[in-house]
């Protein structure tokens, strides 16, 4: 009996010693709709880090720049020609501070989803084109990519001219030659929202014969988008999008931050949403507030990853939502760099070789990957 009491006491002390994001793990059960057990491959991360040896002739500066010297993070991902392709946000060394450098998108491909070969120059960047006033000097940030059944790749990204952030659209057939279409909401409501702050889009997708493709619901394409809150928009052509509005004519908020939770400050959309047999599964990034309004189990201002379930027949209807994140900053490089509060910022996810590969930004500085095997039963969410 004495030994049994000692064991119980040990467990209680161990639980009390658990700290914020990145501490030892407790466990709790997931609902059956959630995709729980994303695992970090041992010895793999980070998969992409800054490189000071690569240079690119910038058409806007008309000079050679070390385009990925400072930070490489916040990746989109897709599958092309049997390989995983990641588009990562790369910042040059032109200044100091988040959002003060120029961002361009690098291209990396992989045969196994874990080891990547990078191109030496960016494939997407501010240029002397129709979008230069909206993209220069801040750049092209935080992409998400999805593909149609007939092979049209659709990228949503943030245009940043250091005055206003705008969600924009580009399309490609080969992932290297892109057509920029400009702000996603440029034509909606007679251009009312073209100068409104917007970013972070998750197009609804589905699996068809093992391929993740853009889905239609009631004859329209749908996407969740937003940073401070989650909104919904629809499109008939994947280029021009119409955000849904509430009874007051403002953006319809289908999901908002929750006081006392890990997502108490922001609920920012992540990779493409997935249409499942339970509903529409939305992966998102939750930012934790400091103080009493946040979740004291997690570091103040940290970004952790959450999941929410929406109704497949009514994509504006939130059915359920995880109370705890399914993925949190743990590794040193996820809690250092530009964002030492801790960040796992999920933006890319692909179905590849019967598993789901999740790609994320590590503290706004590097790129990591986690893998989910749907054949493996869900264990538990990581609690601090």
Question: Which residues fall in each region the model found?
Answer:
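Bacterial Sec-dependent N-terminal signal peptides
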Residues: 1-27
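Beta-rich carbohydrate-recognition and catalytic domains
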Residues: 21-74, 78-138, 146-265, 274-339, ...
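Donor nucleotide-activated moiety binding/catalytic core segment of transferases
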Residues: 263-269, 342-345
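Short glycine-rich, acidic/polar surface loops and turns
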Residues: 334-336, 344-347
